[in-house]
């Protein structure tokens, strides 16, 4: 059974293996043992902290095969994007250039560097083993975070954002970076992403142009790549769009990938999930798949189960499922249909 749980210090070697296979652009999952160790330690401190409002906390989860102990995925939530440093994005805007004497009235698409999204909660670090990308476990790895948020709303902001990795070709060339960022740094896209993952995106962002960029002046390839999704990030994009996220007015400052945005209370898994009592018995012989969590904090667990459940009734769990979730008879779980 695959179980989602908080990452632990002992997970570091396997987490680094996952990071090494993650696509370029996932700067929140650097292939660097020291940074990953810091990430896990910060997460452990966040799970242990008493929190009444969102602050500097970050929560890092792993997806584990309970039989073998192998990690096959990971994901994270940052409680407040840009808590310790500005969270930069490019904002899509329209400038109007007009001349009454020439009867000209042109609307021009521009990009403005901003940190409007600072303070929102941020979904990051999504990775799932390639053979699981099209499976229900990709849903568990992504949406399990949302059920954690549903159980602990005081720890998160009223809005959630996620930066989706933008388009780059098989050689790692990003048309958007080549047209914009590379003019300000003597770095190719892969080098820039690695550097930002090992250090900070902020110091690079602060060297980006602070005046609006006129989109029509960019090469066609760069314009066409704006808002486009990297093939390996498509599953993340699709899952979150089904959750009610929208492509807002922002794109990533490095690769031009879309930034998704949603009101926390309107996210499907949060709005439609239910807390129900547990009855332990035989596993149902038929049913539909549900994401199920124990709603706990440091001992948080989430799994996918086929359940025959009706609203207003207890949910029947097998002994194996109850043990995986760490719940007993009469306890409660939070669930939502896949």
Swiss-Prot record:
Gene3D superfamilies: 2.40.40.20. GO terms for biological process: arginine catabolic process; arginine catabolic process to succinate. Pathway: Amino-acid degradation; L-arginine degradation via AST pathway; L-glutamate and succinate from L-arginine: step 1/5. Keywords: Acyltransferase, Arginine metabolism, Transferase. GO terms for molecular function: arginine N-succinyltransferase activity; N-succinylarginine dihydrolase activity. Catalyzes the transfer of succinyl-CoA to arginine to produce N(2)-succinylarginine. Also acts on L-ornithine. Heterotetramer of two alpha and two beta subunits. Belongs to the succinylarginine dihydrolase family. This is Arginine N-succinyltransferase subunit alpha. It comes from Pseudomonas aeruginosa (strain ATCC 15692 / DSM 22644 / CIP 104116 / JCM 14847 / LMG 12228 / 1C / PRS 101 / PAO1). The lineage of its organism: Bacteria, Pseudomonadati, Pseudomonadota, Gammaproteobacteria, Pseudomonadales.
């Amino acid at each position: 059974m695959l179980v989602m749980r908080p990452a632990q210090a002992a997970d570091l070697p396997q987490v680094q293996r996952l990071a090494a296979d993650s696509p370029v652009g996932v700067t929140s999952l650097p292939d660097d043992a020291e940074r990953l160790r810091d990430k896990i330690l910060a997460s452990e401190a966040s799970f242990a902290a008493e929190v009444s409002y969102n602050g500097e906390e970050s929560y890092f989860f792993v997806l584990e095969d309970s039989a073998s102990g192998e990690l096959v995925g990971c994901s994270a939530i940052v409680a407040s994007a840009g808590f310790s440093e500005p969270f930069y994005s490019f904002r899509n805007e329209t400038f109007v250039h007009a001349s009454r004497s020439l009867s000209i009235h042109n609307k021009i698409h521009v990009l403005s560097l901003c940190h409007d999204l600072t303070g929102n909660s941020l979904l990051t670090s999504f990775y799932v083993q390639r053979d699981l990308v099209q499976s229900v476990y990709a849903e568990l790895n992504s949406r399990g975070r949302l059920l954690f948020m549903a159980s602990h709303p005081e720890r998160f902001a009223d809005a959630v954002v996620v930066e989706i990795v933008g388009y780059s070709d098989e050689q790692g060339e990003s048309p958007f970076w080549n047209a914009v960022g590379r003019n300000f740094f003597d770095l190719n896209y892969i080098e820039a992403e690695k550097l930002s993952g090992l250090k900070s995106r902020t110091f690079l962002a602060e060297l980006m142009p602070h005046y609006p960029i006129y989109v029509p002046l960019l090469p066609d390839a760069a314009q066409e790549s704006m808002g486009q999704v990297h093939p390996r990030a498509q599953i993340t994009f699709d899952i979150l769009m089904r959750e009610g996220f929208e492509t807002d007015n922002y794109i990533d400052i490095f690769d031009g990938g879309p930034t998704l945005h949603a009101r926390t209370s309107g996210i499907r898994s949060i709005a439609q999930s239910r807390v129900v009592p547990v009855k332990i018995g035989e596993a149902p012989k038929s049913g539909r798949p549900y994401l199920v969590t124990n709603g706990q904090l440091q001992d948080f667990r989430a799994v996918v189960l086929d359940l025959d459940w009706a609203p207003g009734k207890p949910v029947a769990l097998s002994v194996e499922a109850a043990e995986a979730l760490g719940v007993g008879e009469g306890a409660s779980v939070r669930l939502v249909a896949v």
